[in-house]
């Protein structure tokens, strides 16, 4: 099938090549043989009158022309998929759809497990692929590689629709066996005490509280950096270090790790967790159904599971 001289099948090949950046992987992703994919590259070069790709070992490097085409081609294919191919009534009880979702370990532990339980009852054949926060989840969102991104509202992209889920606050914690640490710290004590901090992605981007401290000119003595909040309690145990954690995660680990809340002379940030989805999925019935579940469960959690900070403060001797 040709449109203005372009074989439309070549757009699928071009999308695979710009996504995978590897000839073999691109061919495999669309069930083509490697010789057939090589032939497709030749035809693409002829049509666009550009080299499009150069080889660097096994990696395909995109020319500026190919870089410019990549997002336009992906958006076009997504529009076809969402508006034509996938447009049909969504029946949760019969659907076998797999939702790909990027979220933090914190959200998995204190929130998303409830989503999984509910979906198992209402849509038993629906499945999930849960992905960690990468260095650039927004590119995955724009390309339609993921269905949802669940992050603090602070980190949302302005290019896609979103919905608020719930608010959360950070608290400073220490191991309860650290008897030398007072129940309240001065700002000098806070910045000079060794910290365990969470970071995300290949480039170890700081979390919300990390950005908050940086923007307010507060330089901590970070001694240990871990990938995600859930690794902080076991690393903190038995040490003289402190850390900042979401309050609900502290409560989640209350019976597992000896944690106590430390009072600080500065307020740590309150933040809002939110969900974002590709703009092209905005009218997708399956996406709408799942978004409603996310918001409903967040509302239910907020009303029935208010943080129990007072008990943890009493453990700290305040």
UniProtKB/Swiss-Prot annotation:
Keywords assigned by UniProt, alphabetized: Activator, DNA-binding, Nodulation, Plasmid, Repressor, Transcription, Transcription regulation
Domain of life (superkingdom): Bacteria
PROSITE patterns referenced in this protein's UniProt entry, alphabetically: HTH_LYSR
Protein family membership: Belongs to the LysR transcriptional regulatory family.
Pfam families: HTH_1 (PF00126), LysR_substrate (PF03466)
One GO MF term: DNA binding
Protein name per the record: Nodulation protein D 2
Keyword Zinc among UniProt keywords: no
Keyword set includes Repressor: yes
Lineage: Bacteria, Pseudomonadati, Pseudomonadota, Alphaproteobacteria, Hyphomicrobiales
Function: NodD regulates the expression of the nodABCFE genes which encode other nodulation proteins. NodD is also a negative regulator of its own expression. Binds flavonoids as inducers.
Organism: Rhizobium leguminosarum bv. phaseoli
InterPro entries hit by this protein: LysR-type_TF, LysR_subst-bd, NodD_PBP2, Tscrpt_reg_HTH_LysR, WH-like_DNA-bd_sf, WH_DNA-bd_sf
Domain HTH lysR-type: 6-63
Portion annotated as DNA-binding: 23-42
TM stretches of this protein: none
